[in-house]
């Protein structure tokens, strides 16, 4: 499954066939190939790529040796893609084609501590008719002596956001290889400047326009 690392620049819109298309601009690559894993030596086929330069003085000795063995400068981020065997010494945006379906993974924006209405879309309590200080409460969270506890996974107030989120089957609208830019239709998780992982769509089908 081919993939590349990049940075979310932001959203804009472009005109295509007299239609405005909302797109997310991603600055992707070039990502140097740090390691190629084979079935003979590692038990599976994969490629490890790096992204975002890192000062050598901030890299520990084992990782310095890892990068030196590959003959590439140290990078801040390393990711592995199985079943991907690109040519050359780096991965660029031209691994994808316009119209291709991809999956985008990012870290969602942190929202801090939120209640059940914002976090889980609960309806809350009545707005009036005797309701007092119950407008945004979740309601009952359990039973009685049996089971005598709150079940694991119960949807309650708490920290929201800052989670790994993947949006599937996004369309590649345009590729600007000279600028290392990919324009993807729709929204991608995370704030501007955040790390984005772009992969071939895992669930795309020919009926949906996947490749």
Curated annotation (Swiss-Prot):
GO terms for molecular function: rRNA binding; structural constituent of ribosome. Pfam families: Ribosomal_L3. Residues 125-148 are annotated as: Disordered. GO terms for biological process: translation. GO terms for cellular component: cytosolic large ribosomal subunit. InterPro entries: Ribosomal_uL3, Ribosomal_uL3_bac/org-type, Ribosomal_uL3_CS, Transl_B-barrel_sf. Gene3D superfamilies: 3.30.160.810, Translation factors (2.40.30.10). Keywords: Ribonucleoprotein, Ribosomal protein, RNA-binding, rRNA-binding. Belongs to the universal ribosomal protein uL3 family. PANTHER family: 50S RIBOSOMAL PROTEIN L3, LARGE RIBOSOMAL SUBUNIT PROTEIN UL3C. HAMAP family: Ribosomal_uL3_B (MF_01325_B). One of the primary rRNA binding proteins, it binds directly near the 3'-end of the 23S rRNA, where it nucleates assembly of the 50S subunit. This is Large ribosomal subunit protein uL3.
């Amino acid at each position: 499954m081919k993939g590349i690392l990049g940075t979310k620049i932001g959203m804009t819109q472009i005109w295509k066939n007299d239609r405005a298309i909302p797109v997310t601009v991603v600055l992707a690559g070039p990502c140097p190939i740090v390691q190629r894993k084979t079935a003979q030596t590692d038990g599976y086929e994969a490629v490890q790529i790096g992204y975002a330069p890192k000062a050598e003085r901030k890299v520990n000795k084992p990782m310095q040796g890892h990068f030196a063995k590959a003959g590439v400068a140290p990078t801040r981020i390393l990711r592995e893609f199985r079943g991907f065997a690109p040519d050359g010494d780096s991965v660029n945006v031209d691994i994808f084609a316009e119209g291709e379906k991809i999956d985008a993974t990012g870290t969602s924006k942190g929202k801090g501590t939120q209640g059940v209405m914002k976090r889980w879309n609960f309806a809350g309590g009545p707005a009036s008719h005797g309701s007092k200080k119950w407008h945004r409460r979740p309601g009952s969270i359990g039973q009685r002596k049996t089971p005598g506890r709150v079940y694991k996974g119960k949807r309650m107030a708490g920290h929201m956001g800052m989670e790994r989120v993947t949006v599937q089957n996004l369309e590649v609208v345009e590729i600007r290889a000279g600028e290392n830019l990919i324009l993807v239709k729709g929204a991608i998780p995370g704030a501007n400047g955040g790390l984005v992982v772009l992969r071939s769509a895992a669930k795309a089908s020919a009926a949906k326009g996947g490749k």
